[in-house]
Amino acid sequence: MYKNVFVIDHPLIQHKISLIRDENTGSKEFRELVEEIAMLMAYEVTRDLPLEEIEVKTPVAVAKTKVIAGKKLGIIPILRAGLGMVDGMLKLIPAAKVGHIGIYRDPETLKPVEYYCKLPSDIAERDLIVVDPMLATGGSACAAIHFLKERGAQNIKLVNLIAAPEGIEAVHRDHPEVPIYVASIDQGLNEHGYIVPGLGDAGDRLFGTK
C-alpha cells in the first residue's frame, strides 16, 4: 500500500503490541513491553547493514566468517516518548551513539515545537535511526528529520510502533527517501490528533505522568 514502509508483523511483536494497547496495562509493564518491541524491531531495521568477511581462529580450525562492515550507527529518540525505545535498540546495537531531539506537538495547532537538541558530533558519518512510539500527524517526525538533515545527516530511518496513514503520508511528502518501520498501521486520527485505535498517549503511559 505504501512505498518505503515496512510493517514488521513478527508474532512476538504483534502479541506485545496487543498488550500495550490494553488500557489496563500499567506503566511498569508498558515500559518493559515497549523496550522489548524496540529490541525486536531493531533486528529488522538493521537487516541491510553491510558485512565483510574475516578469519577467526576457533579451538578447532580457522573459520571464514562475517562481521558488520564498520558502519557507525546513531539512535535519535524524539523526546519524551522516544526514550522508551532506546534501551531496547541498544541491546542489539550497543555501540550506537544516542542523540536527543525534544519536539512536542502544540495541542491547539498540532504543529511541532522544538525545545531541546543534543546530537553526536559526527552525525554526518552515521546511519541514524529516529525512534518514536507513535507516528500520528507526522509533524514531529518530519521536523526531527528536517533538523537532522540540516546538521548533515545523510542516511535516516524512522521507527515507530504504531502509525496513522496521515503520518506516513506526511513523512513521504517531506522526506520520500526515508524508510519507515512500523509494527502496525492503524485506521487514522481522531479530531484531537490521536491515533485510532492507537494506545493513548505513549509518553503518559511510559512515565505515568500527563
UniProtKB/Swiss-Prot annotation:
The keyword Zinc does not apply. InterPro entries: PRibTrfase_dom, PRTase-like, Upp_B, UPRTase/APRTase, Ura_phspho_trans. GO terms for molecular function: GTP binding; magnesium ion binding; uracil phosphoribosyltransferase activity. The keyword GTP-binding applies. It holds the Pfam family UPRTase. It catalyses: UMP + diphosphate = 5-phospho-alpha-D-ribose 1-diphosphate + uracil. It is an enzyme of class 2 (transferase). Allosterically activated by GTP. 5-phospho-alpha-D-ribose 1-diphosphate binds at R80, R105, D132, P133, M134, L135, A136, T137, G138, G139, S140, D201. SUPFAM superfamilies: PRTase-like (SSF53271). Binds 1 Mg(2+) ion per subunit. The magnesium is bound as Mg-PRPP. Pathway: Pyrimidine metabolism; UMP biosynthesis via salvage pathway; UMP from uracil: step 1/1. Uracil binds at I195, G200, D201, A202. Its EC number is 2.4.2.9. Its cofactor is Mg(2+). GO terms for biological process: UMP salvage; uracil salvage. Keywords: Allosteric enzyme, Glycosyltransferase, GTP-binding, Magnesium, Nucleotide-binding, Transferase. Belongs to the UPRTase family. PANTHER family: ADENINE PHOSPHORIBOSYLTRANSFERASE (PTHR32315), URACIL PHOSPHORIBOSYLTRANSFERASE, CHLOROPLASTIC (PTHR32315:SF4). Catalyzes the conversion of uracil and 5-phospho-alpha-D-ribose 1-diphosphate (PRPP) to UMP and diphosphate. HAMAP family: Upp_B (MF_01218_B). This is Uracil phosphoribosyltransferase. It comes from Thermoanaerobacter pseudethanolicus (strain ATCC 33223 / 39E). The lineage of its organism: Bacteria, Bacillati, Bacillota, Clostridia, Thermoanaerobacterales.
